[in-house]
């Protein structure tokens, strides 16, 4: 099973999601996009290093296609963000070119580090890399990936990225991140996500979630699209 499939299977364990309260802060919209296919994806090995591998020729096609897809809906973005990893920045570039501004790099959008499991086969990730994230989704956020982060540390840094986007003044932002990071954070924090559906059809390269909300009152799923096929 691929890392994408394993992450999806783990998310079914996360059944209790954060419900929004009466809004006390203005809401914004954030579209979280998974990066296009990278050389790491194509290799079948876990690669969470920074800056990490580039996207493949197929990945470039996917990056172009998701830009057309998002802009084709008549959506006008006023902010663009990417992680510290080159594959998200390359995926963001066609959108950045269309917007006429470079992506702002946010460390909190980076992939969950594999720690001691870096470079191991993706097929084994369910018994290695994803053991701790499975515990996060079951409520134990103190579980740590050996040589990497625990659930509280991961959640805090992604929260900080979302806070930075909110504080920027952008009201319709697009942010490029990573499969495990997006799916895990969304399952932990976003109202309206169906873990069973996500488990059966995990986020593909250039798949995305559109969220509405704010860091104080919480986030709600507006729509999702598993773009790359």
Feature locations, PLM:
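Generic beta-sheet signal
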Residues: 30, 171-179
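Phosphate-handling substructures
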Residues: 54, 96-159
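Secretory targeting and sorting signals
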Residues: 1-24
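Active-site-proximal alpha-helix that buttresses catalytic centers in soluble enzyme cores
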Residues: 25-105, 152
């Amino acid at each position: 099973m691929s890392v994408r499939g394993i992450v999806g299977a783990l998310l079914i364990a996360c059944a209790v999601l954060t419900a929004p309260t009466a809004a006390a802060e203005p809401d914004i919209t954030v579209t979280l996009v998974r990066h296009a296919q990278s050389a790491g994806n194509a290799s079948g090995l876990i690669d969470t290093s920074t800056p990490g591998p580039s996207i493949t020729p197929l990945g470039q096609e996917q990056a172009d296609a998701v830009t057309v897809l998002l802009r084709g809906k008549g959506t006008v973005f006023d902010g663009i963000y990417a992680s510290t990893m080159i594959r998200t920045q390359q995926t963001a570039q066609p959108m950045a070119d269309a917007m006429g501004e470079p992506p702002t790099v946010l460390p909190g959008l980076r992939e969950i580090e594999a720690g001691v499991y870096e470079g191991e086969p993706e097929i084994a990730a369910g018994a290695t890399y994803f053991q701790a994230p499975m515990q996060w989704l079951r409520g134990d956020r103190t579980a740590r990936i050996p040589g990497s982060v625990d659930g509280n540390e991961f959640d805090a840094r992604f929260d900080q990225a979302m806070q930075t986007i909110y504080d920027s003044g952008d009201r319709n932002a697009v942010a490029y991140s990573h499969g495990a990071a997006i799916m895990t954070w969304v399952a932990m924090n976003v109202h309206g996500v169906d873990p069973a559906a996500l488990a059966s059809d995990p986020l593909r390269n250039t798949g995305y979630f559109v969220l509405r909300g704010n860091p104080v009152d919480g986030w709600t799923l507006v729509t999702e699209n598993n773009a790359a096929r």
